[in-house]
Amino acid sequence: MKSLNNKKGIILAGGNGSRLNPITLATSKQLIPIYNKPTIYYPLTTLMLGDIQNILIITTLKDQENYKTLLGNGNNWGMQIDYAVQEQPNGVAEAFIIAEKFIGEDRVSLILGDNLFFGQELSNLLKKFNLKNGASIFAYPVNDPERYGVVEFDRNFKVKGIVEKPKNPKSKYAITGLYMFDNKVIDYSKKLKPSKRGELEITELHEMYLRDEELKVNILGRATGWFDTGTFDSLHEASSLIKTLEKRQGLRIGYPEEVAWRNGWIDEDKLRTEAMKFSHNEYGKYLLTLIED
């Protein structure tokens, strides 16, 4: 598939979402609302901010139609959105094997469908993304690094290793759910063997690039916000924060129509058409203010 700008994106929205049962017995966790928008709008707009117009949504078979109903083929936002199925939760790295035809000869970014980012710092990094060789990941300081894949550094702050959920973390920098790769990621993924938990681990992909000295780690500062919204508490915290940012600070996050318009993918007439679909609520009214301003 030909890319609109030689960059492609994948949103991994599969999995069972068992930590959010019983809600996820009936729906995908990435369709659960975070404040006033479905969760998947947030990773989607993160990729859009990186000027990525070709996006593949990887879902379970039972949830795919719901995603198609919500997102369509992307034309309303000047994009191309395609879909693929991950039949079993066989690991994040399997996404690149599933997406081989979609990726073609392009470079690719992958974001986990339950990850929420915000902040101008990340937006600037994404816009500058022009990776031709190697891989680029994003690390964020956390208080509980044992819950995540962790980047370890030497005394000169050079990446020394990556450890998945270490019992005794040697670093506070967790690897977030946003990754950028060159085209070698397809072949590298095919070389992976299932881990002890039966999955193709994204951490092992990072280690392969690290051994080749082709892994770049971007440290995100406190000006950037990041949530892994895979638990009830984190969902509530993310919703509360988005509400506060929108109501008190006027900072709007996660509106695909707005990002598409600001990127020049749709014009004002198209933005107005999309806004009128929701003119009865605050979502649509906000989009209309963009034109009025």
Ranges and model annotations:
Residues E257-N263:
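Charged/polar low-complexity intrinsically disordered segments, enriched in acidic residues
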Residues G119-E146:
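Conserved donor-nucleotide/metal-binding helix-loop-beta segment in metal-dependent transferases, i.e.
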Residues M1-I11, R19-P22, I32-P33, K37-L112, ...:
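Conserved N-terminal catalytic core of the sugar/cofactor nucleotidyltransferase
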Residues L20, Y67-L71, S189, A238, ...:
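Hydrophobic packing residues within well-ordered alpha-helices of enzyme cores
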Residues S109, S123, K127, K158-E257, ...:
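Catalytic-core segments of class I nucleotidyltransferases/pyrophosphorylases
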Residues L31, V151-F153:
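A structural signal for short hydrophobic beta-strand segments in well-ordered beta-sheet cores
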